[in-house]
UniProtKB/Swiss-Prot annotation:
Tissue distribution: Detected in liver (at protein level).
Single GO molecular function: lipopolysaccharide binding
Underlying gene: Psmb4
Full protein name: Proteasome subunit beta type-4
Subcellular location: Cytoplasm; Nucleus
UniProt signal peptide: none
């Protein structure tokens, strides 16, 4: 019997004390002692966007809002997907366009679509206003940013409700504001000055003037932004609802291209 207990003691030598867990010793194969393993960090799947979209433009006009975005999904610097939509109709009074990671935009489309369905199922005659969608996106983006797992998008929300045009901006950090004209991505440097130049001289535009202005800016972006593409959509929201047109293309002229040098 004593020999039995001695053999048992030898078998369990180095084992865990009562109430404790067994610690697996480190081996050359790379196994790590759980006690010394680093704590699990935040999820970082969206820290490296794969397919991205560039600028989104938005302008208020008398009786509505117009936004525009090209249809290119860039895989790094490769013009990989050339027929994707970056504009979403949320409901009859609201639309949005997104730049940044396309996968995150698809996720937001799914969430917003389900929110709208849930609201319609109540059958109370109410729907989300453009300002409500903008407010929700602000909280959603800030929440994800605070969890160190942001949705890598910058969005332009346009809408028309209660006789008022609405144009709002939300970025991946939850920064949000409203303005008569908006541009994301490279358009903030190239298109926004053109939009503001016109609005400073003529604060209230007609629908035709706003559309022509946006088309002009999309042409300039195609000339100057290497991640843009000459296939785009234009969405307009008025009291009649949301209308998305496209794919469209702008008339371009490259006759002076041979005169530009110094960028080889």
């Amino acid at each position: 019997m004593e020999a039995f207990w001695e053999s048992r003691a030898g078998h369990w030598a180095g084992g865990p004390a009562p109430g404790q867990f067994y610690r697996i010793p480190a081996t050359p194969s790379g196994l790590m002692d759980p006690a010394s393993a680093p704590c699990e960090g935040p999820i970082t799947r969206t820290q490296n966007p794969m397919v991205t979209g560039t600028s989104v433009l938005g302008v208020k006009f008398d009786g509505g809002v117009v936004i525009a975005a090209d249809m290119l999904g860039s895989y790094g610097s490769l013009a990989r997907f050339r027929n994707i939509s970056r504009i979403m109709r949320v409901n009859d009074s609201t639309m949005l366009g997104a730049s940044g990671d396309y996968a995150d935009f698809q996720y937001l489309k799914q969430v917003l679509g389900q929110m709208v369905i849930d609201e319609e199922l109540l059958g109370d005659g109410h729907s989300y206003s453009p300002r409500a969608i903008h407010s929700w996106l602000t909280r959603a983006m800030y929440s994800r940013r605070s969890k160190m797992n942001p949705l890598w998008n910058t969005m332009v929300i346009g809408g028309y409700a209660d006789g008022e045009s609405f144009l709002g901006y939300v970025d991946m950090l939850g920064v949000a504001y409203e303005a008569p004209s908006l541009a994301t991505g490279y358009g903030a440097y190239l298109a926004q000055p053109l939009l503001r130049e016109v609005l400073e001289k003529q604060p209230v535009l007609s629908q035709t003037e706003a559309r022509e202005l946006v088309e002009r800016c999309m042409r300039v972006l195609y000339y100057r932004d290497a991640r843009s593409y000459n296939r785009f959509q234009i969405a307009t929201v008025t009291e009649k609802g949301v209308e998305i047109e496209g794919p469209l293309s702008a008339q371009t002229n490259w006759d002076i291209a041979h005169m530009i040098s110094g960028f080889e």
